[in-house]
Every structure is written in structure tokens, then in C-alpha cells.
Amino acid sequence: MKILLTCLLAITAFAADVTKPHIPLAQQPLRMAKDITAFEAADQANPPPQHALLFTGASTLRMWKNVGEEMKPYPVINRGFGGSFTTEVLGYMDRITLPYHPRVVVFQCGGNDINSGDPVAAPIARIREYLARLRKENPDCAVVFVATTRAPSRKAKWPLLDEYNRQLEQIVKEGKNLWYVDINVALNLPNGEGKPGSYLKDNLHPAAEGYKAIASVLKPAVDAAWQATEAAYKK
């Protein structure tokens, strides 16, 4: 009887979890306030340069420890944080994007939104809002949008991630001084599986070799964006 009761409770709990409705991220509170406060404290202690190359987004950027070396000679500010959603990159942009008056922004975020259950249209709309606010305050800024990774651990979400990347690329086609970089060609094999050594054991985040591969496809776009803004930032 105890075994039967245990099984019934387990089934009930599983069913409740499966049927639990997704709460849209736009209706959820912003997380990781401590990370943002830490960035602000670091800025107070050692003010970063204005008109730099700003990286903003989620953990793929946060974990890129040698991004400054890979992106030389440009001055780099890395403000990737946690496993952030686009709601948070947008919600905190007054604190960790706009104060820097960046010359070029490298933006990668959105995959976590989709993995959480938000439809593709939701992060795409937030990215459009982010871009509009950025350009209102900093009209000469260029943006390099980085595709979300089709990581092996998220294989079930690949079709949605592919659609997200297509729509992200469309944003770039519609605007000026925008670039789109598909890092999946650097990280993954033609069949979609990760190249040997590209990912950590979690099959989600890039390993050191993966970051080298990302840099090889990202740096040319950063070079082009920096050159395109040369005249605007000479004044």
C-alpha cells in the first residue's frame, strides 16, 4: 500500500509539473540585481572608457574570460551576466548599456527566453525595443547581433532557436550599422552536433576552443562595425 501511495503521489506531482502553465517572462520580476550592482561598483572603482566595445547578454558572454584579448586592439567592456533573459538585458540597460555610450555593442541573448517557454516573437520584440532605445540615446552606435547557440543540450529546441536566429538576422537586414554573426558554423558540425572540444561538459556553454572559434567569425564583424563608426566617433 505504501508503495502504491508513493507511486500515485509521484505521478500526481509529475502531472502537475507538466501541466503547469508558462508565465511569460515579461510578467516575471527581473533577477540578478546583485550582478548589476556589482557591475556598478566596479565602474565606480575603475571607470570604464566611453565609446568602447560593449558585450551584453547572457552566460555565453559572461563566461568569455579572455574576450579582451581576443578583441584587441579595441577597448572591451564585458557585461554578460547570469543566464539572463532579454527582459533583463532590456530592463537593466539604463545601468549597464547606456551609461557607457558604446561605439559598438555585441549582443547575444534570447536563447534562454525560448528555453524557458517564451515564443520566438517575445525576445525578438524586446530586442527591437532595446535597439530603438539604444539608438535614441546613442544614434551612431553600431550593433553586432550574435546568433543564439544551437547547443547539443538544447536539441529539442533547435527548430525554435533556428526561427529565432532567422528573425534576428531579419532585424539586421532592416537597419543601418547592424551585423549578424552566426557562431553555430564555428561551433557545430554540419549535422548540428557540436564539434569536438567546442563545448563544456554541460553541452551548453563554449569551451576554450569554442571561444577561439567564435572569435574567428565574430572579429571580422567587429572590425567592420568599428570602421563604419570611425567618422562619427572622431568628433
Q: PLM ranges: what are they?
A:
Residues 79-84, 106-119, 128, 135, ...:
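Cell-envelope and extracellular/periplasmic
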Residues 150-235:
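Catalytic His-Asp segment of secreted/periplasmic serine-dependent ester chemistry enzymes
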Residues 61-77, 86-125, 144, 148-152:
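Oxyanion-hole/transition-state-stabilizing segment in secreted/luminal serine hydrolases
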